C-alpha cells in the first residue's frame, strides 16, 4: 500500500449501518498497512471521536467554505482513557461533528426529558444533537473538543447543591460548575444550570436522595402525565437551550 491514496466520496451511500461499520473497520486496518484514505462522509459511523486528529470539517459560511482541523492533544493522562471509554460506551456521540448546534448534558434523564419537553413546547430542532456525556466530570472534555472544531454548543448541567449533600460534596460540585463555566467559549457556547438538577426542576421542589432511583423512567413518566404543568422557570430554560 506504500504511496497509495484512496479517495472515497460518501462510502455510506449504498451501505446499511452494519456494512458501514464493517467498511470503516476495514479502512482503519488498511491505514496500518500504509494506505492513506481520504473519505468524505455524512455518516457518524465513519467517524470515531477518539481519532479527532484525523478529522477535517468543511463548513459553508455564506459564500465561503471554512475548514477546521485540530492536530494537537486535547486531553492528557487519565482523560484520554476516560474519553475513549465514553465513545466506546456510546459511539452515537460522533454525530456531534455534523450538528448545527450541540447540546451537552450529563446523563440519560436530561437527554430523554429535554427532547420530550422541547417537542411539547414546539422548539425542538432536528439539526441539533443532544450528547449525553456520561457525567458532569466528562463535560469539560467535550467542551474542549467542540471549541477546537468551532462547533456551536450549549452546556446543560446540574448545580448539585442539594440540601442532603455534605460540605465536601458541595465544594466538589461548585468546583466542577466553575470549571465548566470557564471553559465555555463566549464565541461558540453558553451554559444553562439546573437547580439543583432536572428532577427538582420537573417537580418544582427539593428532592430526597432516596427518590433518585430509575431517574429516566420516573422523570419521563411525570412529564407525560395528563395534567402535568411545566414550571415556568424550566420552560424558559428549555427555550434558551434550543434557541
PLM region spans:
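Switch/communication elements of ASCE P-loop NTPase nucleotide-binding domains
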Residues: 1-92
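Acidic, Mg2+-coordinating catalytic modules of nucleic-acid enzymes
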Residues: 90-104, 108-243
Amino acid at each position: 500500500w506504500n504511496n497509495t491514496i484512496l479517495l472515497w466520496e460518501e462510502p455510506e451511500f449504498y451501505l446499511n449501518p452494519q456494512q458501514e461499520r464493517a467498511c470503516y473497520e476495514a479502512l482503519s486496518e488498511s491505514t496500518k498497512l500504509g494506505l492513506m484514505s481520504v473519505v468524505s462522509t455524512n455518516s457518524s459511523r465513519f467517524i470515531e471521536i477518539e481519532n479527532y486528529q484525523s478529522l477535517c470539517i468543511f463548513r459553508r459560511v455564506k459564500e465561503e467554505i471554512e475548514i477546521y482541523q485540530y492536530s494537537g492533544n486535547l486531553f492528557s493522562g487519565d482523560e484520554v482513557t476516560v474519553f475513549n471509554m465514553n465513545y466506546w460506551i456510546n459511539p452515537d456521540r460522533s454525530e456531534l461533528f455534523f450538528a448545527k448546534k450541540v447540546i451537552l448534558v450529563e446523563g440519560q434523564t436530561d437527554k430523554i426529558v429535554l427532547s420530550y419537553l422541547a417537542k411539547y413546547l414546539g422548539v425542538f430542532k432536528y439539526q441539533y444533537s443532544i450528547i449525553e456525556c456520561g457525567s458532569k466530570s466528562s463535560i469539560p472534555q467535550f467542551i474542549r473538543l467542540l471549541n477546537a472544531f468551532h462547533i456551536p454548543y450549549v452546556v446543560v448541567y446540574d448545580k448539585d447543591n442539594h440540601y442532603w449533600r455534605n460540605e465536601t460534596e458541595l465544594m466538589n460540585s461548585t468546583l466542577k460548575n466553575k470549571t465548566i463555566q470557564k471553559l465555555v467559549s463566549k464565541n461558540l457556547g453558553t451554559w444553562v444550570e439546573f437547580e439543583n438538577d432536572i428532577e427538582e426542576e420537573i417537580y418544582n421542589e427539593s428532592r430526597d436522595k432516596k427518590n433518585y432511583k430509575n431517574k429516566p423512567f420516573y422523570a419521563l413518566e411525570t412529564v407525560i402525565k395528563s395534567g402535568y404543568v411545566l414550571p415556568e422557570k424550566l420552560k424558559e430554560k428549555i427555550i434558551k437551550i434550543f434557541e
